[in-house]
Amino acid sequence: GEDEYAEGIREYQLIHGKI
């Protein structure tokens, strides 16, 4: 999206249970 970095973090948190 417009902020791929933020989306990447979002994906990571969803997958890894919010670090």
From Swiss-Prot:
For this UniProt entry, the molecular function terms from Gene Ontology, in alphabetical order, are: ion channel regulator activity; metal ion binding; toxin activity
Cofactor binding, note field: Adopts alpha-helical conformations in the presence of divalent cations and is unstructured in the absence of divalent cations.
What else does the entry mention about this protein? Answer: The mature peptide does not contain cysteine residue.
Question: What is the designated name of this protein?
Answer: Conantokin-Pr1
Which UniProt keyword terms apply here?
Calcium, Gamma-carboxyglutamic acid, Ion channel impairing toxin, Ionotropic glutamate receptor inhibitor, Magnesium, Metal-binding, Neurotoxin, Postsynaptic neurotoxin, Secreted, Toxin
Q: Mind giving the lineage of the organism this protein is from? A: Eukaryota, Metazoa, Spiralia, Lophotrochozoa, Mollusca
Q: What cofactors does this protein use?
A: Ca(2+); Mg(2+)
Of which family is this protein a member? Answer: Belongs to the conotoxin B superfamily.
**Location (main, coarse):** secreted
State the source organism's domain of life.
Eukaryota
Where would you find this protein in the cell? Secreted
Regions annotated as coiled coil: none
Binding of a divalent metal cation, residues: E7, E11
The tissues where this chain's protein is expressed are given as: Expressed by the venom duct.
Q: Name one GO cellular component term.
A: host cell postsynaptic membrane
Record-listed 4-carboxyglutamate modification sites: E4, E7, E11
- Record flagged with keyword Magnesium: yes
Q: According to its UniProt entry, what is the function of this protein?
A: Conantokins inhibit N-methyl-D-aspartate (NMDA) receptors. This toxin has highest potency for the NR2B/GRIN2B subunit. It induces sleep in 10-day-old mice when injected intracranially, and hyperactivity in 24-day-old mice.
